[in-house]
Structure formats: structure tokens, C-alpha cells
């Protein structure tokens, strides 16, 4: 798949097999088959943030609706900004950093301070693709130093007088308000951000958006009628929040050691991403598709495929409880081969 006009998280990834493997159906389960309470506790809701409340307030409402102890959103939106606010629940909040650092897409209404030739507007916008320099706004939670951020693509959707509607895919931490200001300067007419909506955040898109009202209704249906179906629709397994990361698939016998904080050795791997780079953040999965941990790759794909020993990855955040899988069982007759 071409990477033009796409976020890094949208580039297709493929797995390569290192060795055959078996998984025991007695231990663990596919993420979508978790009991409902565990499903909620290890879930993520792709909330459609309305204009008005802060991102923190929206996350707090999600927490209150579902009765979970913790809820964390993946990247703040200003109060007036709408759109995607993926909110991880309970134990899934450990995966927030992986999603927060992923690329984002926005649709923006730029208001120029005077009308400019449409052809020139399109040309100048295109010149902002690639690395750009930005200084965080005065009212910012981060230190005000010049930073480099990557603009993956800009597509002008509509121009009417002084109004410009454009779609932009960018690196996490890009200030779209500052981008609008800089485009206005480059055009020589000035400009400012009039309105903004986030349309993609890592692997999440508008197709799976859920309103707070829909979330509340789904929870009530389950509590009052015992119907889990709508709740399972609006809440997605936490695994969907890291689907953009390179994957390493573990043997069942290696899972518990990683859950206890041990590094992942090469013999514990059955398959992995075809383009894993040393030092890259990777997601460790079971053969059933369960997220075990986020880890730093200590070898690249080629090195892992050639090696028979050594440390392949070091866990950074463990999301699966120790004891979910037994320690080093080998009874293949009780297993399902994959």
C-alpha cells in the first residue's frame, strides 16, 4: 500500500513466521470473548467529543458512566474542538502512551484575513508537508521551545472567499492553530483557525465513533435488561488501541514470564512484524490475539529470524496479569495448533 495521504498507523503490516506453535484453549481467550466485566476493564471507547467540555471532563464522564476506576484519553483536544477522543478504560490505560504518540488527522476551517487566489492557497498549503518547525503557544502545558513536527499530508477540500477547508495528517503534538497562522503568513494575508475536528487518531477513525449518550444507553441496556450486545459494540478491546504497532506473537510458554516482567527471549517468539526495527516500540500478543505487553525491540526482524537465543524485546508496560497462562506447559495433545 502506498503511504501517500496516509498516517503511519494506516500503512499495512505483515507478519513473518519464525516457528510453528500451539495454543491451549484452556488458558486465556480471544479479546472479544472476555466476560463482560473484564471486557469493560480492558476496553477502549472511541468517543465523539462535543464542543464545550475539556478532554479531561469527557474522560471523567466516561469513567462515571461505566463505573471504572480509571479512564485515560489519548491526546487532549481544546474545549471547542470536536471529534475523536479514544478513551481507554481500567487496566487498558497502560496503553495510553502508545496511542497518544500516534499520528492524528484533522479537518480544519482556516479563515484568511483576505481572499487569495485558490491556486496559490493550494500551492502554499502543499509546501507545508514534511518536517516543519513549531513553537508551542503561550498557553501550553509543554516547555516553549522550537520543535520539529511532521506533516504527512495536507488536502484542500474547499475554498470559498476567505474560508479554506482542509484535511491534514500530522505527527502527534502538532499545533493546528499554529499551522493555520503560519499558512496565513506564508500567503501574505494572515489567517487563523476558525474551527477544528479530529477525524483520525492512530488506528481509530470516525467509523467507530460513539457519543456519550450512546455509551450511557448501552450501559443501561446491560444493567437493566442484561443485554451485553450494544455495550460490546460501543466498547472495543484494548488490543484495537495498539493495532498500529509492530507485533510480536508469543508462544504460550513465554507469556507468563513476560507478565512477570522478564525480557522476551528469541525462543519464545512464533511470528513477528516483517519490518520491526531495533529500538522500536512493539506490542506483544498471545496466539489468541491478547495484548500481553508493550516492549522495546532489542533486535530487528532479520536478527530475530536468524537467532536461536538472546533477548528480542524488553517489556515497558505489562497489561496481562501474571498467572493467565501457566509456566512453560508443553502438552501439545491439549492444544490447538496455529
UniProtKB/Swiss-Prot annotation:
Catalytic residues (UniProt): 78
Broadest EC class assigned to this enzyme: isomerase
Keyword rRNA-binding: no
UniProt xrefs under CDD domains: PseudoU_synth_hDyskerin (cd02572), PUA_Cbf5 (cd21148)
Pfam family, any one: TruB_N
SUPFAM superfamilies according to UniProt: Pseudouridine synthase, PUA domain-like
Record's keyword terms, sorted: Isomerase, tRNA processing
Recorded superkingdom: Archaea
MF-aspect GO terms: pseudouridine synthase activity; RNA binding; tRNA pseudouridine(55) synthase activity
Any GO BP: mRNA pseudouridine synthesis
PROSITE patterns membership: PUA
EC number: 5.4.99.25
InterPro entries, per the entry: Dyskerin-like, PsdUridine_synth_cat_dom_sf, PsdUridine_synth_N, PUA, PUA-like_sf, PUA_sf, tRNA_PsdUridine_synth_B_fam, TruB_arch
Reactions catalysed, as given in the entry: uridine(55) in tRNA = pseudouridine(55) in tRNA
Residue ranges constituting the PUA domain according to the UniProt record: 245-320
Family: Belongs to the pseudouridine synthase TruB family. Type 2 subfamily.
Main function: Could be responsible for synthesis of pseudouridine from uracil-55 in the psi GC loop of transfer RNAs.
Protein name in the entry: Probable tRNA pseudouridine synthase B
Species of provenance: Methanosarcina acetivorans (strain ATCC 35395 / DSM 2834 / JCM 12185 / C2A)
Amino acid at each position: 500500500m502506498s503511504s501517500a495521504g496516509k498516517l503511519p498507523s494506516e500503512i499495512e503490516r505483515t507478519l513473518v513466521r519464525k516457528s510453528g506453535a500451539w495454543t491451549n484453549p484452556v488458558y486465556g481467550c480471544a479479546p472479544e470473548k472476555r466476560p463482560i466485566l473484564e471486557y469493560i476493564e480492558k476496553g477502549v471507547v472511541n468517543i465523539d467529543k462535543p464542543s464545550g467540555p475539556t478532554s479531561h471532563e469527557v474522560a471523567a464522564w466516561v469513567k462515571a458512566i461505566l463505573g471504572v476506576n480509571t479512564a485515560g484519553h489519548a491526546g487532549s483536544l481544546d474545549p471547542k474542538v470536536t471529534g475523536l477522543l479514544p478513551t481507554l478504560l481500567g487496566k487498558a490505560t497502560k496503553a495510553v502512551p502508545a496511542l497518544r504518540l500516534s499520528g492524528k488527522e484533522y479537518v480544519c476551517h482556516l479563515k484568511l484575513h483576505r481572499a487569495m487566489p485558490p491556486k496559490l492557497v493550494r500551492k502554499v498549503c502543499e509546501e507545508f508537508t514534511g518536517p516543519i518547525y513549531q513553537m508551542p503557544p503561550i498557553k501550553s502545558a509543554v516547555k516553549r521551545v522550537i520543535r520539529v513536527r511532521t506533516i504527512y499530508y495536507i488536502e484542500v477540500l474547499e475554498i470559498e472567499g476567505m474560508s479554506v477547508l482542509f484535511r491534514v495528517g500530522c505527527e502527534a503534538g502538532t499545533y493546528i492553530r499554529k499551522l493555520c497562522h503560519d499558512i496565513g503568513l506564508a500567503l501574505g494575508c494572515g489567517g487563523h483557525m476558525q474551527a477544528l475536528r479530529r477525524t483520525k487518531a492512530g488506528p481509530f477513525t470516525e467509523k467507530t465513533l460513539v457519543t456519550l449518550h450512546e455509551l450511557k444507553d448501552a450501559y443501561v441496556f446491560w444493567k437493566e435488561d442484561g443485554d451485553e450486545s450494544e455495550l460490546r459494540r460501543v466498547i472495543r478491546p484494548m488490543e484495537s488501541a495498539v493495532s498500529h504497532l509492530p507485533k510480536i506473537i508469543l508462544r504460550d510458554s513465554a507469556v507468563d514470564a513476560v507478565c512477570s516482567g522478564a525480557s522476551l527471549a528469541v525462543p519464545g517468539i512464533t511470528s513477528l512484524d516483517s519490518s520491526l526495527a531495533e529500538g522500536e516500540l512493539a506490542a506483544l500478543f498471545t496466539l489468541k490475539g491478547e495484548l500481553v505487553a508493550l516492549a522495546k525491540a532489542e533486535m530487528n526482524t532479520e536478527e530475530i529470524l536468524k537467532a536461536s537465543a538472546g533477548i528480542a524485546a524488553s517489556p515497558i508496560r505489562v497489561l496481562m496479569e501474571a498467572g493467565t497462562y501457566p509456566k512453560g506447559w508443553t502438552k501439545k495433545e491439549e492444544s490447538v495448533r496455529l
